[in-house]
Amino acid sequence: MADRISTGELGRRPGQGRVNLLLVGDATRYFLAGSMQKFFPSTAQITLTISNVKKVAVLLAANSFDIIFLKVTSTLTAEEQEAAKLIRSGKKKNTHLLFAFVIPERLKGYVSEYGADISFSEPLTLEKVNTVIHYWKTYFTNTDMENTELPPECRLYFQTSRSELGGRFSTDMFLCSELLKNDARLGLKAPLSSLDKSKQASFLHSTKEKLRRERIKSCCEQLRTLLPYVKGRKSDVASVIEATVDYVKQVRESLSPAIMAQVTEAIQNNRRFSKRQMPIELFLPFSATSQREDAMLTSAFSPVQEIQLLADRGLNVYSMTAAGGALEGAVRGQPGSVSESSIEDLYKTRVPSTARSLNSFHSVKYTSGTVSPHEAAARTNQNISTYLPPTAPSVSNFIPQHCNAMLCPARPTSPNCLCTPGHELAASSRAASASIFRGFRAASASDHQASQPPALPSPQPHDSSYF
């Protein structure tokens, strides 16, 4: 049935002949590339884009995808949960988007809340990918879904219970239930036993507790950098919290009621501090530049195993028949011009069906920007060094992220660009916090000087004080 669909029916618009796929996470690209070439006609143009979970929002806003594969880790971090929610919200705008969720075996049965159309447990085999493609071509490529009535056995059900589907699918997904329940390739099984449910609940509880402790640890590390340096002060969590309480009390006493009202209003307007917690914005490392060699790596092995996709880049794949049986071909990435309006530079390639080759890349390491005198003063008496982990994958793996004009705070050609080698990481958050408190003290001092006579000098703090 699937191979009868013409090129005009592929994608979201008739006659488009193009399929856009997004792989979020460390997806199994070998199976996907081989399945794309096998199941789609030779005239179909396939665009594969690989990205991490941090750039899902940017990619969804700038592009329209047909199939999105989200592969999560065994810990199911907050960033991955946020990416799943973004993809789910994107399905409301693009009804022809298929969301495939690839989860570890230990998390099987606990993905219904993320609204995935199809969920698979690892490993992601070629058979599972083919099932996803067949399902998308059957139910997501109709260009006039609003005016077309599906047969009764394939209607869309929005209120199917979890127990009926073995807890593998969402209750509000686009689902042809009769077909899916009779399709053994989807791996639908009976509901989990009470022992398995208990193990899964215990694992999820420990995962949430681990995330909570990581949040506490991250906040304490930020407090250590924001607090004034005191020689001999303990650095454990309890001591840092106690020192923070004392410091906040001193700051509140030094601020005028008008400024305190402004601070209170700003905190109340911040949705992060509301009862309904928003996802934490985790640290996004700066992009890194890379250098390309002119040499090429050629091979005559299986085309499925030789296709290597670049991190955060796209590949346009054309299925072609090798002329004369010669085992030659090339996958040559062409870097796009960097501009402020560009969001993702796509590498477009022509891929023959018999051989592949890939340009080699140098491994790069993260660098940082210069430290201004103002920021250096904010770090006075502090001996803190910050290092970003180097990224040095092999040629056959993903390369580090490239410097992008939209993601880099400065132009790549500027000497102040944070992606330029030879600079240090700027402690912007620490300097900004110090400048805020200094601004509060200055404003408070001006209010008191205008309305009150000069006050007596304040007594010096005792030796036992933290400050």
From Swiss-Prot:
Quaternary structure (record): Forms both hetero- and homodimers with SOHLH1.
Low complexity: bias regions: 443-453
Induction comment: Up-regulated in mice lacking Sohlh1.
Phenotype of gene-disrupted mutants: Knockout mice are infertile. Infertility could not be rescued by SOHLH1 or SOHLH2 transgene expression due to a lack of expression of either genes in rescued animals.
InterPro entries for this protein: bHLH_dom (IPR011598), HLH_DNA-bd_sf (IPR036638), TCFL5/SOLH1/2 (IPR039583)
Listed SMART domains: HLH
Role this protein plays: Transcription regulator of both male and female germline differentiation. Suppresses genes involved in spermatogonial stem cells maintenance, and induces genes important for spermatogonial differentiation. Coordinates oocyte differentiation without affecting meiosis I.
GO biological process, one term: regulation of gene expression
Protein name: Spermatogenesis- and oogenesis-specific basic helix-loop-helix-containing protein 2
Compartments it resides in: Nucleus; Cytoplasm
UniProt keywords, alphabetically: Cytoplasm, Developmental protein, Differentiation, DNA-binding, Nucleus, Oogenesis, Spermatogenesis, Transcription, Transcription regulation
Domain (bHLH): residue spans on this chain: 200-251
